[in-house]
Regions:
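Acyltransferase
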Residues: 173-199
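Residues at alpha-helix caps and immediate loop-helix transition turns in enzyme cores, especially N-
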Residues: 16, 62-63, 140, 177-181
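Residues in and immediately flanking transmembrane alpha helices
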Residues: 20-23, 144, 170, 182
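Acidic di-acidic motifs
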Residues: 8
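Glycine/serine-rich loop-strand microenvironments at binding/catalytic pocket rims
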Residues: 1-5, 160
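Pocket-forming structural segment of enzyme catalytic cores
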Residues: 65-73, 77-81, 86-176, 188
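Flexible gly/pro-rich beta->alpha loop and the following alpha-helix that scaffold active-site loops
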Residues: 2-3, 11, 15-80, 92, ...
Length: 199
């Protein structure tokens, strides 16, 4: 299985690259967010897409580049991490707002719904957070899948399309069960069937 990894110019992309390679058995195809257009991405032979963390805000096109097109138009499963998670909320009409507290390498216990990305992961697992923005009110097509003890949204899922987002960093060495989460994304991709059979 091969993942297209959209790099939003973030140092954590390197960690994602290695962990996805281990989980999938194939190295991801890495493309910077301003390197290729949507029409240039679509011929790539990949099974799913991960949108990396990055600096900036999801409503600023220069910060997320082609990530917004991916979220709007892709029929492949997509996982957004941190900025990618916020971009999923933004593109569907959700609110992205200042966090109650800026998180810079902080560990937080995360609770979740136990399904999808979080299948087989214990409640209260520790995850690393680097963010000053959070997802707020969500549109009807998204639902919350994970949260902190003070109810900050940590995971979202589209109700009808194969789109997921996590605010924390599963690729960090300090995040518990990050490998399991990415394996779950791989398995969710397999459950969708081959690209030609989707839609």
């Amino acid at each position: 299985m091969r993942t297209l990894l959209i790099d939003n110019y973030d140092s954590f992309t390197f960690n994602l690259f290695h962990l996805l390679g281990e989980v999938n058995g194939d190295e991801p195809v890495v493309v910077r967010n301003d390197e290729l257009s949507w029409s240039e991405l679509t011929p790539l032979a990949v099974d799913n897409i991960v949108i990396s963390p990055g600096p900036g805000r999801p409503e600023h096109a220069r910060d997320v580049g082609v990530s917004l097109d991916v979220l709007q138009r892709s029929e492949l499963p997509v996982l957004g991490v941190c900025l990618g998670h916020q971009a999923l909320a933004h593109i569907t009409g959700g609110a992205v707002e200042h966090a109650p507290e800026v998180m810079h390498g902080r560990l937080s216990p995360i609770d979740h719904d136990g399904r999808g990305l979080f299948a087989g992961i214990p409640q209260g697992f520790a995850a690393v957070r680097y963010h000053s923005l959070v997802v707020g009110a969500l549109p009807a097509e998204l639902r919350v899948t994970a949260w902190t003890l003070d109810d900050v949204v940590m995971g979202i899922e589209h109700r009808t399309r194969p789109l997921w987002g996590v605010q924390f960093h599963p690729e960090s060495i300090l995040t518990e069960h990050g490998r399991t989460l990415l394996r779950n994304f791989r398995d969710l991709t397999r459950a969708q069937g081959p690209p030609a059979a989707r839609g």
